[in-house]
From Swiss-Prot:
Designated name of the protein: Dihydroorotate dehydrogenase B (NAD(+)), electron transfer subunit
Binding-site positions, [2Fe-2S] cluster: 220, 225, 228, 243
Gene that this sequence comes from: pyrK
Pfam families the UniProt entry points to: DHODB_Fe-S_bind (PF10418), FAD_binding_6 (PF00970), NAD_binding_1 (PF00175)
Xref: InterPro entries: Cbr1-like_FAD-bd_dom, Cyt_c3_hydrogenase_gsu, Dihydroorotate_DH_ele_sf, Dihydroorotate_DH_Fe-S-bd, Dihydroorotate_DHASE_ETsu, FAD-bd_FR_type, FNR_nucleotide-bd, OxRdtase_FAD/NAD-bd
Family: Belongs to the PyrK family.
Originating organism: Streptococcus pneumoniae (strain ATCC BAA-255 / R6)
Domain FAD-binding FR-type: 2-100
An example Gene Ontology molecular-function term: flavin adenine dinucleotide binding
PANTHER family, per the entry: DIHYDROOROTATE DEHYDROGENASE B (NAD(+)), ELECTRON TRANSFER SUBUNIT, DIHYDROOROTATE DEHYDROGENASE B (NAD(+)), ELECTRON TRANSFER SUBUNIT-RELATED
């Protein structure tokens, strides 16, 4: 159930150039699931629209969650100035999240993340690892300075890293690794830039458990304004809203 809450800032640090990890504390954490996002109000009077930021990790015991975001404009730049003890007006948790049901030690799962789309996969990896699921993760970044969460994800399984310029890991994009993987995966979870999502959507089009977590500009965040709609294959009238029906969609169910 979506709620409004004033959450407390526990900590914040810059983990890569213009990329920040923000730790929030509040009752809302108890309702959070992997793959959901929060809609944050910018703490000033000039920015009316909330900013959607995906949940990176969830600590229900301490009622804390981690958000990782990149400065994209004035709103997120203001978020980066927050420090311990500050508060944020938060709406959430929002979205359907990833379906992790019925996976156990007999299963093998592929996680694919690119750039600022990597953070929501951290909670997925953690929860799957706790169930004994074998996790293989493929990450794509522009260059070595943009690499995030590789060490954290390596706690939960094998991690491959690609960079566009070859400055870290394997040169190229995630397809270089995925096309060479011999393993069969029981589920695929992904989040990244539009080009990466199109590749995953096509490559795993007929996979019964392949999922895309999609990013979109949002206004209301409640499904009422239809600012974040996606078309559905073979339909001129039906659409899906990223904020309300997503952000997670099965491959082949939306047009990218």
């Amino acid at each position: 159930m979506i709620r409004l809450e004033t959450m407390k800032v526990v900590a914040q640090e810059e983990i890569a150039p213009a990329i920040f990890e923000l730790v929030l504390e509040g009752e809302m954490v108890e309702a959070m699931r992997a793959g959901q996002f929060l809609h944050l109000r910018v703490p000033d009077d000039a920015h009316l629209l909330r900013r959607p930021i995906s949940i990176s990790s969830i600590d229900k015991a301490n009622k804390q969650c981690h958000l990782i975001y990149r400065i994209e404009g004035a709103g997120t730049a203001i978020f980066s100035t927050l420090s311990q003890g500050d508060t944020l007006d938060v709406m959430g948790p929002q979205g359907n999240g990833f379906d992790l049901s019925d996976l156990d030690e007999q299963n093998q799962v592929l996680l694919v993340g690119g750039g600022i789309g990597v953070p929501p996969l951290l909670e997925v990896a953690k929860e799957l690892h706790e169930r004994g699921v074998k996790v293989v993760t493929v990450l794509g970044f522009a260059n070595k300075d943009a690499v995030i969460l590789k060490t954290e994800l390596a706690q939960y399984g094998q991690v491959f890293v690609t960079t566009d310029d070859g400055s870290y890991g394997i040169k190229g994009n995630v397809s270089v690794v995925i096309n060479d993987l011999d393993s069969q995966f029981d589920a695929v979870y992904s989040c990244g830039a539009p080009g990466m999502m199109k590749y995953i959507n096509q490559t795993f089009d007929d996979h019964p458990r392949a999922y895309l977590s999609l990013e979109s500009r949002m206004a209301c965040g409640m499904g009422a304004c239809y600012a974040c709609v996606l078309k559905v294959p073979e339909s001129e009238t039906v659409s899906q809203r990223v904020c309300e029906d997503g952000p997670v969609f099965r491959t082949g169910t939306v047009v990218l």
